Structures are given as structure tokens and as C-alpha cells.
Design a protein with these regions (language model features):
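N-terminal pre-domain and mature-chain start segments
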Residues: 1-119, 123-151
């Protein structure tokens, strides 16, 4: 079953009704849905460089028109790095590593121990949008989520 661009936009915007969402999730994906999804995302950004692959909400692999390089870019237009590097190393990072910082998010007795877990929050340097969160042990290196096979 093929869905209209309007229905897919409702999905992207979080406005789709539950019945349609259930049907979408439980049936095979139609062939043109990903292309329509990219078109919708492209319409939501202010820059013209084509989106190659969305990495998450407000984070994309794009092809810069100026030099045709594939870059990881935020919705605000910040180019973090080439697509095959870890963009998190170029983001603004907040590390919650004290009990007081953990208690900003969790009730006191439910907060993780900062000796065993920290919370790393990655932000866009331009807009301040929260792009990702990880909760590793304090000594663990920055996690490189994945490198897509798109060459």
C-alpha cells in the first residue's frame, strides 16, 4: 500500500493517527516511501545541499554542492565532519558526572551512580538542539554509533 506525501509528513511530524501508524508498521514498506521521506526532510531545512541519509532527528548526511563532499550536518546547517567520521567529536558536549547533575534528571534514589555511569549530551553548536544522548561508564570512549555503507 502506497502512502501519500501528506501521510508520510504526518508521520515525520508526529501527527499521524494510531491506526495508520499501526498499518504502516505492520505491512511491507512501499518502494517510494524513502524517497518521499527525503523530500519531506529536504523541505524542512533551509539549505539546498541534498540529503543523502538521515542519521537522526535534525542530523543528516548531505552532499555539499560546493565541493560534492559528503558531510554530517545538523538541521541548523552546521557541518560537523566528513560522513565517515564520528560527528560527536565535533559537537558541543555536556557530561553529567556528578550526583547533583544526575538528580536534575532522576529522583535521588533512582539516579545512576556517577562512579559507574555518566550521561553525555551532544548538541548542535549553532542551534543548541540536543542531537544525541549516551549513558556509558565514565571511562568509556565516545561511542561511534555506526558508519553507514553508502559508498
Amino acid at each position: 500500500m502506497a502512502y501519500t506525501k501528506t501521510k508520510i509528513k504526518d508521520l515525520v511530524d508526529g501527527k499521524i493517527d494510531r491506526d495508520t501508524l499501526h498499518t504502516m508498521l505492520s505491512t511491507p514498506k512501499d518502494k517510494e516511501r524513502f524517497q518521499i521521506y527525503l523530500e519531506i526532510l529536504q523541505e524542512q531545512v533551509e539549505w539546498d545541499d541534498p540529503i543523502i541519509l538521515p542519521l537522526g532527528p535534525k542530523l543528516y548526511i548531505v552532499q555539499r554542492k560546493s565541493d560534492r563532499k559528503w558531510m554530517i550536518r545538523s538541521q541548523a546547517g552546521y557541518d560537523f565532519c566528513p560522513w565517515n567520521e564520528n560527528w560527536k567529536l565535533h559537537a558541543r558536549i555536556r557530561v553529567r558526572d556528578t550526583a547533583a547533575q544526575m538528580e536534575e534528571l532522576y529522583p535521588r534514589l533512582m539516579a545512576p551512580s556517577p562512579d559507574w555511569q555518566v550521561i553525555r549530551e551532544y548538541f548542535c553548536p549553532i542551534s543548541g538542539d540536543l542531537l544525541d544522548v549516551e549513558a556509558p561508564t565514565p571511562w568509556y570512549p565516545v561511542i561511534h554509533d555506526f558508519e553507514p555503507d553508502i559508498d
